[in-house]
Design a protein with these regions (language model features):
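Conserved glycine-rich beta-strand-loop-beta hairpin in the small C-terminal domain of fold type I
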Residues: 143-146, 150, 166-175, 187-200
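Helix C-cap/helix->beta junction micro-motif
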Residues: 63-64, 94, 218
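Active-site PLP attachment segment
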Residues: 90-128
Length: 229
């Protein structure tokens, strides 16, 4: 029951100041797999995947018979001028060979509503998913969740626009502060979401020493980058 032993990590590559998918490695790793979990946009890297990247993923997964789970919970937090492209809209193959998971919980700060939703366009997959949800009694939901989702998506545009502008301001502030006070720590500017990935390689410190530096010197308890690979 240690599920991570069944996983293959598809590592990203560093390219022009941003993480990108290593398609050559992906083609090899995907062979023999049954399922690919896509984080779109990527968390914590903040990458909004390009259409050509998503199209290539769709082609490879269709060829290898691999179902795609597309986690798009950060989609509503895509920062201008970037545009999020839902995986299922890339092609008919992507549409019929994927399950998309979304929720307003990240963008509208409402995880307590347990108001996620799933998009399945393939009728056979949808039926299998429904049977699984019913068997596990996970299909019940509650009325308040439905109302909160409707309110967020119907009346939350102005609030979300202001939220994105505020997030962008935070990113600009952190970037400017580090350039002035800690130039060896580089901000990987996210294209989506409120998470900022800090490149500390120029610090030339071990992971343990780096964690100690942030806690003892900077007085910041941050998520250790090593946990993300």
């Amino acid at each position: 029951y240690y599920y991570w032993e069944l996983l293959e990590d598809s590592h990203l590559k560093w390219e022009n100041g941003m993480y990108r998918m290593d398609m050559d490695a992906f083609r090899e790793l995907i062979k023999g797999c049954k399922l690919f979990i896509l984080c779109n946009p990527h968390n914590p890297g903040g990458v909004v995947w390009k259409e050509e990247e998503l199209r290539e993923i769709a082609e490879i997964c269709d060829k290898e018979g691999v179902l795609v789970f597309s986690d798009e919970i950060h989609a509503d937090l895509t920062l201008p001028p970037h545009r999020h492209r839902p995986f299922a809209t890339i092609s008919e193959k992507a549409r019929m060979n994927s399950i998309t998971f979304m929720s307003p919980s990240k963008a509208f700060n409402m995880p307590g509503m347990t108001a996620s939703h799933v998009l399945i366009f393939n009728p056979a997959l949808r039926q299998r998913f429904r049977k699984f949800m019913e068997a596990c009694e996970l299909d019940l939901g509650h009325a308040f969740a439905f109302l909160s989702v409707e309110a967020a998506y119907s009346h939350g545009t102005e609030w979300l626009d202001q939220c994105l502008a505020y997030i962008q301001g935070n990113i600009d502030y952190v970037d400017a502060f580090l350039k002035e006070h800690a130039p060896k720590i580089k901000v990987v500017r996210p294209q989506a979401s409120y998470l900022i990935w800090l490149d500390c390689r120029e610090m030339e410190m071990s992971q343990e020493a780096l964690n100690k530096f942030f806690v003892d010197k900077a007085h910041l308890a941050l998520n250790d980058g090593a946990m993300f690979g």
